[in-house]
Regions:
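Positively charged, Gly/Ser-enriched RNA/tRNA-binding surfaces
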Residues: 1-2, 10-14, 24-26, 44-57, ...
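Short secondary-structure junctions
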Residues: 3-7, 218-219, 316-324
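Polyanion/phosphate-binding surface patch
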Residues: 10-39
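Acidic, His- and aromatic-enriched active-site or binding-groove loops in soluble protein domains
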Residues: 26-34, 135-159, 164, 241
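Short acidic-glycine loop/turn motifs at beta-strand connectors
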Residues: 32-35, 92, 241-244, 335-336
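Short, conserved phosphate-binding/catalytic loop or strand-edge motifs used
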Residues: 81-85, 121-128
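Short internal beta-strands
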Residues: 117-121, 300
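N-terminal hydrophobic or amphipathic helices and topogenic motifs
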Residues: 291-343
Length: 343
């Protein structure tokens, strides 16, 4: 079973300074405590658990938590408190343990009693491709930014600028097409493999699918997922809820971090973002509350960053479009359910 982990609100800043690359953001709130030590308001729970878990060889320790962390907000550019509930499995993590954690993630989403979807991926497929194409280390960060943004045109241009040929650039942009139902996308991805690292990643995903069985029905595979590559090294997964524009669940394997504290140990876990889930109880946008004939809200967005910022604010209020207006050549994008249209 899982044992509850109770974290202190503060940690010595040295912990976050040493493991900064594993944090979602390098900015933390620090203060000098009464004993003269520099401390920080906790920006992460997993680091604290990994530091203290210390599983013995062959042992698997399991924890769950319900905690608050403090992180910078990209929208408000201020620090905000984030309420998380999650679990961690540390030590001897095998395929069965990995499948058990993913099954718990699926069950957590199902308990919300609203339409949800879990997307999975594997960092080994992406890093294997980058290595197989001999992508220069200094070019990878820029390429990954365009991959995260699902921007095929800029990704191809950046690949060519990095010295890759047309075939290699096409292999990178082809990642954006490897998205869909888990089984069908696995078959499609096998045909695109260039190295053993990619094949091994797909085999691990196949084992996961087999282990989940009917519990995994509806699971999606997105091999272009490139978030937090410094943190995750194998399986990654993200949960979404209808009506909420951002992910409500994130998790995956973080063996490299775990091995910094306990050599030879592996780890997997996930967190649910309870603040995001509060949107489910929020009032619907006015256009969704109206009965009878639909009334559309037409919005003309300004160009550039101001338009991007305006769209993010509106999407956060429940007025997102079914297509990202930045990723399409269409002059008009809309969301019929929310009765909103962007020009």
């Amino acid at each position: 079973g899982y044992r509850k982990y109770r974290a202190s609100r503060f940690e010595e800043y040295a912990l976050y300074q040493e493991y900064q690359r594993f944090l979602p953001d390098s900015q933390v709130i620090t203060f000098t405590d009464l004993d003269g030590k520099l401390r920080a308001i906790k920006p992460d729970v997993t680091l604290s658990i990994a530091k203290t878990a210390q599983p013995a060889a062959g042992e698997c320790k399991r924890f769950y938590y319900n905690e608050e962390v403090c992180r910078p907000s990209r929208e408000s550019h201020t620090f905000q408190t984030i309420h998380q509930m999650g679990l961690e499995s540390m030590g001897a993590v095998d395929a069965d343990e990995q499948a058990a954690v993913v099954r718990l993630a699926l069950q957590s989403l199902a308990a919300l009693d609203v339409p949800t979807v879990l997307e999975v991926s594997h960092m080994g497929y992406l890093t294997g491709l980058l290595d197989a194409l001999s992508v220069p280390a200094e070019a990878r960060a820029r390429l990954l930014d365009f991959l995260r943004a699902k921007n095929a045109h800029e990704l191809r241009t950046a690949a060519l600028d990095a010295g890759l040929d047309d075939t290699a650039a096409a292999a990178l942009t082809g990642l954006l097409d490897l998205h869909g139902p888990l089984g069908a996308t696995l078959t499609k991805a096998r045909a695109a493999c260039l190295c053993d690292a990619q094949r091994n990643a797909l085999e691990e995903l196949q084992v996961l699918q087999n282990a989940l069985g009917e519990d995994g029905r509806g699971t999606q595979l997105d091999l272009s997922m490139a978030d937090e590559m410094e943190y995750y090294n194998g399986l990654v997964f993200t949960g979404y809820v209808a009506g909420i524009p951002r992910a409500v669940l994130k998790g995956g394997r973080y063996d490299y971090l775990m091995q910094r504290f306990t050599p030879g140990a592996n780890a997997i876990g996930f967190a649910m973002y309870l603040d995001e889930l509060e949107r489910l109880a929020a009032p619907l946008p006015p256009v969704q509350q109206q009965g009878g004939e639909k009334t559309w809200l037409n919005i003309a967005l300004p160009k550039g960053r101001l338009g991007d910022k305006a769209y993010k604010l509106l999407a956060g209020a429940g007025y997102s479009a079914t297509e990202d207006y930045n990723d399409t050549r269409k002059l008009v994008v809309e969301n019929p359910d929310a009765c909103v249209r962007y020009f």
